[in-house]
Amino acid sequence: MHGGTRCGTLPRRVRTLIPWIPPQLLDFPDVSEALDDPNGLLCAGGDLSPERLKLAYSRGIFPWFSEGEPILWWSPDPRLVLEPAAFKLRRSLKQSIKKQGFEIRTNQRFRDIMCLCSSTRQDREGTWISEEMIDAYVALHEEGVAVSFETYLNGNLVGGLYGVRLGRVLFGESMVSLVPDASKAALASLCQEADRHQIELIDCQVPTSHLQSLGASLITRETFIERIG
């Protein structure tokens, strides 16, 4: 689950190192061809159609680009993942969740979760969650592929997370909190009820100290591709 880095702003010399995919070509290069610097940049172009997005995630690839920039596709090595059973529900977090009285719901306000993720990141440093991205993932949500886990406080939406689900893997995209620990509460609920949701692995994409403190760990890209295959 990546943050708000303006990843699409790349030097021209870097863009010349990666292939360009025409919109009519529904395919990707092999992930072994991804660059080391920037880590995981594989190609540019294509589109955000449901068919292309599903193909991308099934191959361990995800889009990540800034608004107004070309679509960039990534498959970093190593990859940050979270095994639901490895989630660290520390005592302080457990007490905070209980004290605040959060309610967790799924797939009730998918677009709103994406918009919250976009607006909170925009306030900080710009966002990669553009209207184009929102529309693309809402289309996936309507197919039952993109999902959201939402945190409510006194009936109000105060945070959560969203991602793409293929098989037993949830490819996490972004998290948001309007009040302390709201996104962590959604993630904790997801991990605690992973069996019911039939989720065995959560892809966190790129390393963050925040997610690693919650139990996420790094695996090689090769291992990741094997796990999602």
Model-assigned labels for residue ranges:
Residues H2-G229:
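N-acyltransferase acceptor-side catalytic subdomain
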